[in-house]
Regions:
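ABC family nucleotide-binding domain
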Residues: 3-4, 9-214
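H-loop (His-switch) and adjacent beta-strand-loop-beta switch element
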Residues: 211-224
């Protein structure tokens, strides 16, 4: 079953739209799939993630998620859609420096006004799953790179999203921690979560079901 489709999307920047980030780009992702998006720096990978997450919008094309036309959503409606359906994992973790790990993980639930008892239950549950229970009272600066990324993943999945968008999630990690993060993604995928992983690492892409290539904002091939 198809979870999302981005069809013929284009995105231009600059006063006269002279910078092309996406040019008639399309991607379809099946529910329960783990897909890699590969391309060089500046090829448009992050723009694809920003459009799918609703952080940005395309100038043309259509975007459907779960059979619903998301292209029409704006403002608060798009924010609510993102909070309900999508978790985001960044290369450099994007944790709040002055919040301990418990509060970083709990942040999406607090924004959704979930009660304190349920927040505590869910944070401790996901922390146990990712082996970071002992880190919950630590600040991000006290963590290793691998630990920080596991906290970021915990925050991304705490709202039980249908889709995880991961932007170079192993790019700042050593080989051992990269392998551990990919094992976590595999487990999440096996539990039913769909993942789209932006990467430049062929080893990461090899662990995904499919790889979509992007070059100069355009589709440049697919590997299975």
């Amino acid at each position: 079953m198809e979870l999302l489709s981005l069809e013929n999307a284009s995105r231009h920047y600059g006063k006269k739209s002279q910078i092309t980030a996406l040019d008639d780009f399309s991607v379809r992702i099946e529910e329960g799939e783990m897909l890699a998006l590969m391309g060089k720096s500046g090829s448009g990978k992050s723009t694809v993630l920003n459009i799918i997450s609703g952080i940005d919008e395309s100038d043309s094309g259509t975007y459907c998620f779960g059979g619903e036309d998301i292209s029409r959503k704006k403002g608060d409606a798009m924010t609510m859609f993102r909070r309900k359906n999508i978790g985001i994992v960044m290369q450099h973790f994007a944790l709040v420096d002055d919040m301990d790990c418990f509060e970083n993980i709990a942040l999406p639930l607090r924004l959704a006004r979930v009660n304190k008892k349920e927040i505590s239950r869910r944070v401790n549950e996901v922390a146990q799953k990712l082996d970071i229970t002992s880190k919950l009272k630590k600040l991000p600066k006290e963590l290793s790179g691998g630990e920080a990324q596991r906290v970021a993943i915990a925050r991304a999945i705490i709202s039980e999203p249908k889709l995880i968008l991961a932007d170079e999630p192993t790019g700042a990690l050593d080989e051992e921690n990269s392998a551990r993060i990919m094992d976590i993604f595999k487990q999440l995928n096996e539990s039913g979560i769909t993942l789209l992983i932006v990467t430049h690492d062929p080893g990461v892409a090899a662990k995904c079901k499919r790889t979509i290539w992007i070059k100069d904002g355009r589709n440049a091939g697919m590997e299975e």
